[in-house]
């Protein structure tokens, strides 16, 4: 979650695959909360996974504090669980995936793709793979 843009991703109903959904312009907090409320109403997720910009040394810096403060506003208006995930390197991974798929150029925003990386990491960690013989 940045100061200007918020990438949004959504998982499939089985919580196996995360996909980029939309990029929200972050104007003021009230409008941004309203936009996220609309997405939650439309898609009815079980929870929100929010990327937390942890510093490379693992500490919570000023940007992470901003994210936590904004998430507090969200939790006041939504009846949805919020989980934080370390978002370090998510943009780099998203750019690599976009480049590998031929979709990477300077005019394409990668915020939603980075959100999908963060969500996919969460899904992979919480849903162990299963195999049908």
Swiss-Prot record:
Show the taxonomic lineage.
Answer: Bacteria, Bacillati, Chloroflexota, Dehalococcoidia, Dehalococcoidales
Look up keyword DNA-binding and say if it applies: no
Gene Ontology BP annotations: rRNA 5'-end processing
Family statement: Belongs to the YqgF nuclease family.
Which terms are listed as keywords in the entry? Cytoplasm, Hydrolase, Nuclease, Ribosome biogenesis
The record, for SUPFAM superfamilies, names: Ribonuclease H-like
GO molecular function annotations of the record: nuclease activity
Per UniProt, subcellular location reads as:
Cytoplasm
Q: What is this protein called?
A: Putative pre-16S rRNA nuclease
Described by its record, this protein's role is as follows:
Could be a nuclease involved in processing of the 5'-end of pre-16S rRNA.
Q: What is its EC number?
A: 3.1.-.-
Q: What class of enzyme is it?
A: hydrolase
- Show the GO cellular component annotation of the record: cytosol
Q: Where is the signal peptide?
A: none
What NCBIfam families does the record tag this protein with?
A: RNAse_H_YqgF
Please verify whether the record's keywords include Cytoplasm.
yes
